[in-house]
Amino acid sequence: AYHEIDSVSQLAAQYNIPNEYDKLMASIGSEGSNAYTSNDVTCYVENIPSNEIENWARIQANRFRNMIIRGFHTELEAVYEEKNISMGSDGTKEYAALWKLLTPTHPYGTQTTIGEQEHLKNPSIVNIKNYFHRYYVPNNVAIALAGDFDPDATIAVIDKYFGTWKAGKQLTRPEFPAQKAITMPRDTSVVGQDAENVMMGWRFKGANQLQNDTLDIVRRMLSNGKAGLLDINIDQQMKAMETGAFLDDLHDYSAQN
């Protein structure tokens, strides 16, 4: 029962420090502590002073080896609220419908990143921990650094704190059948409260293909906020409320929209 869950959550709260991680990172001068999940990656972001790289490495190495889950119940409520907001967004529903047409038998089209309400109703902490131990392993992680730092010294620090992290033996990568060729236009409608609009998309190969550089140039030629073909011929002449073009360069497939 939910009252039992709440009572246990209150007991757990006695061991919880609110915003513990943010406070820890702020103590070493970090700004912009954040994370996001997309179709292809889960990414954790920090903006740290270059003289705090060692403290950053010490914290992150411990964090990703020894996950401590606190505030699970309250965090779940936050995620559920995000789902509710997305369900009320015509743009979000339209975007999902477009990818369903482009990749009907691939997860890009069959599910959203946040999932369905049913997925959030009864989450399993056991499954979450199993997922962590399978995928949060060094042979499935990339560390990307940019800024004013000594590369050799920084690599030595990373080796010091991450070098003994054992590779995961259970790591698997999902494989999906190739999408069938699109031989004729596909269309659908999304009903909502927003003004009528049209979203069009063309499916291409994945982001690691050279073709994507060309697609990015085409996208900028169409729409760049000032002198794109759509900007000049439609927006500036007030033939539509708004136009735009963007490239979804995902790992398995890209879409020019």
Give the label of every model feature segment.
Residues 1-51, 85-140, 164-209, 220-257:
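Non-catalytic beta-strand/loop surface segments
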Residues 49-52, 147-152:
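Helix N-cap motif at beta-to-alpha junctions
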Residues 54-56, 73, 208-212:
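Solvent-exposed, non-transmembrane alpha-helical starts
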Residues 58-62, 156-161:
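Short amphipathic alpha-helices in soluble, non-transmembrane regions
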Residues 62-69, 162-169:
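A common structural junction motif
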